[in-house]
From Swiss-Prot:
This is TDP-N-acetylfucosamine:lipid II N-acetylfucosaminyltransferase. One of its GO terms (biological process) is fucosylation. NCBIfam families: PRK02797.1-1 (NF002752), PRK02797.1-2 (NF002753), PRK02797.1-3 (NF002754). Pathway: Bacterial outer membrane biogenesis; enterobacterial common antigen biosynthesis. It comes from Shigella boydii serotype 4 (strain Sb227). Its EC number is 2.4.1.325. The lineage of its organism: Bacteria, Pseudomonadati, Pseudomonadota, Gammaproteobacteria, Enterobacterales. It catalyses: beta-D-ManNAcA-(1->4)-alpha-D-GlcNAc-di-trans,octa-cis-undecaprenyl diphosphate + dTDP-4-acetamido-4,6-dideoxy-alpha-D-galactose = alpha-D-FucNAc4-(1->4)-beta-D-ManNAcA-(1->4)-D-GlcNAc-undecaprenyl diphosphate + dTDP + H(+). It holds the Pfam family Glyco_transf_56. It is an enzyme of class 2 (transferase).
Length: 359
């Protein structure tokens, strides 16, 4: 049997590193279909830190796409597992037959499913991408994203799968020991990316709570984002006193980020698509409820796991937040499907599907 090849078709270092390390640590030892990778970006020590994997790096999207297409044409039994899919050349290859549907298995990452970019180049490309998506052999995604995708592509097979968020299962019960009282701290957004719509989110928080809460805005990623960070800071200071606004402009190490999240009482995410699942998982693990946009389909995954969900359209106050905290504290977090290690079973299943080992 031909070994499955995994493709990380865009240079997104933090996600690519997470995926490679997850496969190296959790999957490669038990499946030959979890070892071969083609990646856009620099090695930067990844090969050394992932010795169980065979990783080929490419300088750009086009060079990787050309190599994938060549392999697909040379052997029509060769199957590819695309992690996220921000590579237009690969979509066009699927549409034109360079890559066959039986070779194309796609793990949907939030941003590459939704058509939110306003640039003309993207607007022109989206219709072609929709046509190509009809030809995908199978998609893997969250429950909400599967539902969203099925509305336009009902004939494409879909299987439930969660991004491998870095988590320590031993912390699942830690939140129950913490007493929450006094001024609330609200986390706004999961990064400095503009998709978080920070200014609108800050205005929404202020409308609900006024200047009675402390707002923390993590903006240490992506790099070279100083102008936007300052824009958010100025908008925030028009709404909140300086002591109630904390803009984090430096990237935090994981343990420091975890400690920051555990000081919060509420997460507030205004984006209208699935993103930031890693941050949501860490907040839920810490017993901290989240406010989501009703257009963000991840609420379906949360309710399926019997987790309380608050919406940006709800009338929120401290009593409602504290009640959501109490509800969350009563949930057995060891049973949540999108938590580690529970998502591992899903990965083992989809690897077998993509490799053709199971129907």
């Amino acid at each position: 049997m031909t070994v499955l090849i995994h493709v990380l078709g865009s240079d997104i270092p933090h996600h690519n590193r997470t995926v490679l390390r997850f496969f190296n640590d959790a999957l490669a030892a038990t499946s030959e279909h979890a070892r071969e990778f083609m990646v856009v970006g620099k090695d930067d020590g990844l090969s050394d830190s992932c010795p169980a994997l065979s990783v080929q790096f490419f300088p750009g999207k086009k060079s990787l796409a050309e190599a994938v297409i060549a392999k697909a044409k040379a052997n029509r039994q060769q199957r590819f597992f695309f992690h996220g899919q921000f590579n237009p050349t690969l979509w066009l290859a699927l549409l034109s037959g360079g890559i066959k549907p039986s070779q194309f298995f796609w793990h949907i990452w939030g941003a590459d499913l939704y058509e939110l970019s306003s640039g003309l180049r993207y607007k022109l490309f989206y219709p072609l991408r929709r046509l190509a998506q009809k030809r995908v052999g199978c998609v893997f995604a969250t429950r909400g994203d599967l539902s969203f995708f099925a509305k336009t592509h009902p004939k494409v097979r879909g299987e439930l799968l969660y991004f491998p968020t870095r988590m320590d299962p031993s912390l699942n019960t830690m939140a129950n020991d913490r007493q929450r009282e006094g001024k609330m701290t609200i986390l706004v957004g999961n990064s400095g990316d503009r998709s978080n719509d920070h200014i609108a989110a800050l205005r929404a928080v202020h409308q609900q709570f006024g200047d009675t809460v402390k707002v923390v805005v993590p903006m240490g990623y992506p790099p070279n984002n100083e102008a936007y960070i300052e824009e958010v800071r100025q908008a925030g200071l028009e709404l909140f006193s300086e002591e109630n606004l904390q803009i984090l402009s430096e990237k935090l190490e994981f343990d420091a980020y975890l400690a920051l999240l555990r000081q919060c009482d509420l997460g507030y995410f205004i984006f209208a698509r699935q993103q930031g699942i890693g941050t949501l998982c860490l907040l839920i693990q810490a017993g901290i409820p989240c406010v989501l946009n009703r257009e963000n389909p991840f609420w379906q995954d949360m309710t399926e796991q019997h987790l309380p969900v608050l919406f940006t359209t709800d009338d929120l106050n401290e009593d409602i937040v504290r009640e959501a905290q109490r509800q969350l504290a009563s949930v057995d977090k060891n049973t949540i499907a999108f938590f580690s290690p529970n998502y591992l079973q899903g990965w083992q299943r989809v690897l077998a599907i993509a490799a053709g080992e199971v129907a």
